[in-house]
Amino acid sequence: MKHTLALFLKTGCVVCIFLLLCLAAVHHFKPALSSLPVFSRFERKLPIYCVDTDKPQVAISFDAAWGNEDTETLLSILDKYNVKTTFFMTGGWIESYPEDVKKIAASGHDLGNHSENHKQMSQLSSDECLAEIQKPHDKVKELTGTEMTLFRPPYGDYNNTLIESANALGYYVVQWSVDSLDWKDYGADSIVDTI
């Protein structure tokens, strides 16, 4: 019994000494730890997903990055129902279909920027982000006179560097709150069920 009590007291003393050393170490190194960038006040910047309105509304948008085979039909349907949307266009699409860009603008739809080359924007430097945003901006301005202010990053891929770069060029970075998954080509019924 004496042996068990002595072992218990020794173990308790060792644990107490260890805890005191840990507390002393934390207290001693606390100022150094708080000055490390890892412990800085890093704030993740977020794009716009939705906005508050006085009445229930839906914002519809389209990404124009590859073909234009449905553009005329789409514009006709939107016109028939007096619906205005935003078309987010890549630089390549703008170059390939300048007349469509003009028609979209003339129909009263918003023109949005979807980057020059549809790259993973979070993998780019600030200078590369600026170039990816500025090039399509200049193309649309030359074609339509429109100063675009909305940027949708390809793949929904963003980071602080992208958002800061876009903001520096006068852009708001916007995403979506509902993805129709139309790009998976599941058909109209699937799209309706999704949204």
Residue ranges and their predicted role:
Residues 1-9:
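N-terminal Lys/Arg-rich, disordered targeting/topogenic segments
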Residues 4, 21-24, 108:
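A general, composition-driven signal for non-globular sequence regions
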Residues 6, 15-18, 49-52:
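N-terminal non-cleavable signal-anchor helices
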Residues 34-121, 132-139, 148:
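Active-site beta->alpha N-cap acidic-glycine motif
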